[in-house]
Swiss-Prot record:
BP GO annotations: translation
Alphabetized Pfam families for the sequence: Ribosomal_S6 (PF01250)
MF-aspect GO terms: small ribosomal subunit rRNA binding; structural constituent of ribosome
Species classification: Bacteria, Pseudomonadati, Chlamydiota, Chlamydiia, Chlamydiales
Similarity comment: family membership: Belongs to the bacterial ribosomal protein bS6 family.
Superkingdom of the organism of origin: Bacteria
Gene: rpsF
GO cellular component: cytoplasm; ribonucleoprotein complex; ribosome
Species whose genome carries this gene: Chlamydia trachomatis serovar D (strain ATCC VR-885 / DSM 19411 / UW-3/Cx)
Role noted for this protein: Binds together with bS18 to 16S ribosomal RNA.
Name this polypeptide is given: Small ribosomal subunit protein bS6
Length: 112
């Protein structure tokens, strides 16, 4: 088995609901190709679908949520963030160090 190099991260990405399914797929591909372009490896992608945002972002009240587990050198994170800030289809993103890849994501339902 090949040893993975780099730090394990969990990335949360919220894309605009104005994107068509094809455009959303291309926007997600842009994020994942950015990871691999910096020598990283995408391990798992969780598509959480369309969800209501906690607050309005650039006029949007909903977004498409994706969680991506990936490995990459820590030095590459700043470059990835720079690319994310330039991506107009990406409403919000967050990158955290992870200890393990979660095969299933479970979220508690919040009261309305």
């Amino acid at each position: 088995m090949k040893k993975k190099t780099g730090q394990l991260y969990e990335g949360a990405y919220v894309f605009s609901v104005t994107l068509s399914e094809d455009a959303r797929r291309k926007a997600l591909e842009k994020v994942t190709s950015g990871i691999t372009n910096y020598g990283g490896e995408v391990l798992k992608i969780h598509d959480q679908g369309r969800k209501k945002l906690a607050y309005t972002i650039r006029g949007a009240r909903e977004g498409y949520y994706y969680f991506i587990y990936f490995t990459v050198a820590p030095e590459a994170i700043a470059e990835l963030w720079r690319e994310y800030h330039l991506n107009e289809d990406l409403l919000r993103f967050m990158t955290l160090k992870a200890s393990a890849v979660k095969e299933v994501l479970e979220f508690a339902t919040l009261p309305e």
